[in-house]
């Protein structure tokens, strides 16, 4: 009898100590903050492009580029590199598409230390409305990406021309054509095209 009481008391102490029947408070989900804004106007696309780079967020970066296709199923997004880079890396840019954009961006970001924040500065903006659903933006740019790869510039400059279109199926804007050129205002010898080529593998 005493032995049974002893076991009973032990069970009570064990249950109270472990608190087996209490409900555990769930941990709050980990949400990574992002500055990405639904691109319901053309100018938001440019802001999202800048924030996706500083946040090193490949999904937000790709979301800035159109995923529209023509009647044959071919992607309508096109990137046209600087002429000097294309002369050397024509095979790289011959079939450049969204997958190539994702690949280069991921490679570049993976080579950048976690505590380092890339930066895209845009200057001398020109805005050229084409139609109600199409706008051209022209900027001089300075892109700084302090990565750890030897032989690849950590900062590039040039002039970018972005054709931004409205997708009528969802009411969102995105970049359909991106033209990269050198300009007389360039402070650095290498362009964004060169950076894309070097990180494309």
Where are these regions (language model features)?
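A solvent-exposed, charged loop/short amphipathic helix patch at secondary-structure junctions
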Residues: 25-32, 78-89
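Sec-dependent bacterial lipoprotein signal peptides
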Residues: 1-19
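Short beta-strand edge/turn micro-motifs at domain boundaries
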Residues: 19-32, 134-136, 140-201
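Surface-exposed, charged secondary-structure patches
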Residues: 84-155
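Short, low-complexity N-terminal intrinsically disordered segments enriched in polar/charged residues
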Residues: 18-55, 63
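Extracytoplasmic/secreted proteins, especially bacterial periplasmic and envelope-associated proteins
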Residues: 41-44, 48, 60, 96, ...
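Sec-exported extracytoplasmic/periplasmic mature domains
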Residues: 54, 63-70, 106-114
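Short, well-ordered alpha-helical segments enriched in acidic and aromatic residues
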Residues: 57-82
